[in-house]
Amino acid sequence: MERQKKKDMDFLTEDLWEIILARLPLKSIITTPKLVCKVWKSIIESRCFRDLFQSLHQNSHHSSWSLMCRGCETEIMSHYGSDNWNLNHSLGYYISSFLTDKFENYNEARVVSYTDVGLILVHRVSSQSFYVANPVSRQCVEILPSQKLDCFWILGIATRVENGVVLGYKVVLLKPNFTFLIYSSETGLWSLNSDTFPFSYISQEFNNPISLNGSLYWLAHGSEYQDFIVSIDFYVVDSRSDRCRATPFPDLDKVPKFRRTCTTSQGCLMYMNIFSIPKVDGNLEDKLCVWRLESWQWRLVFEISLDSIKTGFDYIPLGTDPFDAKTVYLWSRKCLLSINLHNGDIVLHKDVEHSSAGRILNSVDCPRDMTYILESNFASFVLPQWMHPFPSTVRSV
């Protein structure tokens, strides 16, 4: 019987295998072929197969994503199910499972950087090694430490992406003398690189960098309460370009309700905050303002009144939907809430919600302590629409 099945499989042409495999969830496509045969592996790594898969799944929901609390792998909220990956659990579950299975001592390894292309950067304290991994597919490579690793800040991982495929990545560390120690997947080597910062500063925050489009972004503080977003493009090809930039926040003439932080949406850097604006009658009105960074200038894209939220000032902005810039999320003492910035609709969410299409929104693990949330840093972790085996010049583990 088994021999007959194998003969039947041998009669299937490569075109037929493409059609069969393209109807599977992305998680199955990535994890199964490497266990079966080289032919399947060759099929799924082709551009034609990727185009076929995306055309068959074009009506699926956006990829799964989660808002993670940095430093502790706590999942603030998650969206998953009924997409290309067809996951049964949230991304936080897969991260926790991956770390538990990968490391004997769970506490010795921590996630230090999240991306919007399905990769996380893990630091193993005992050996000073780094691991670049996709916790869902379990693809993982180990990056051995450089001999120059004495004292450094971990900035994160910058990625080079083309047509949705990760072609390369760089692990970026910053030494106290503001020299970068960079590991490149294309060379398999660590190298030192220095840059000139285009502004004077009092302090910089290296605990919450954002990885986006080959660049890393983080917050810096100048004199007279001037806050900046610092960005460095680690894949700039024009040597004449200023790869290091400092962009002042757009609301320096106002007093924001919350400390300044950024999120990402649809491939852009986003900033939102809440301000008390005087009304005509002299009373104050809370307004949520959202800006998008375009050509190194902040553009106000949404401004909406929050007077309709009748809970007092009892909510904290969390971030923007990675796939929908007009949807933002806030946390109150009772629950997660979302606001549609286009029409002003406000939705109070349950801890777990199931849509009719099978999509799941989960915020059950979010800490209920408002002070904890207020003082935490958050990062979006997003799975891509397609996951090609990511490049590596070091051994897979």
From Swiss-Prot:
Record-annotated disulphide pairs: none
Superkingdom classification of source: Eukaryota
Domain F-box: 6-56
Protein's recorded name: F-box protein At3g28330
Organism in which the protein naturally occurs: Arabidopsis thaliana (Mouse-ear cress)
